[in-house]
Amino acid sequence: TLPPSNVTELLAWIRANKDKATYGHAGVGSASHLCMLMLMKEIGVQMNGVPYRGTGPAMNDLLGGQFDLMCDQTTNTTGQIQSGKVKAYAVTSKKRVPSLKDLPTLHESGLKDFEVSVWHGLYAPKGTPKPIVDQLSASLRVALKDPAVMQRFADLGTGPEPADRATP
């Protein structure tokens, strides 16, 4: 566990320890990797990155103290944050996450232009017949009207985009 207790202290710690501080990520080009690259650019430091084959192995090593910090999606980390297994400093979205309501945004914490948000998609192979894609879309719309599904999304700190931004 790092000594800082808030984002301001964390950024000061990173700057003071930039030559030895390490971060883990879910793989080169992953959201967690890009988030850390953007953060380092924003605060003007370079740290050593440790790539993993997914969030699971990275989270295991974060919990085991193999590296110092990590940026990842709330869908992957909310359980560990709520259980107190990891210390969270902020969310990178524009708005606070309802399931982590006491966690500030980086914007609130002084990084005014910093935002990282991710999205998840449902995919089918190229050439999937239109009736199958249409049925999949219709089933997804039905699922998104289910209060239990929406509550689970909220519990994980995520939610669907407005319908006008969806594609079949």
Task: State the predicted function of each range.
Residues 36, 61-63, 81-84, 136:
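Hydrophobic residues within well-ordered alpha-helices
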Residues 40-42, 69-103:
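A ligand-binding cleft/hinge motif common to bilobed small-molecule-binding domains
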Residues 90-126, 156, 162-164:
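Periplasmic-binding protein-like
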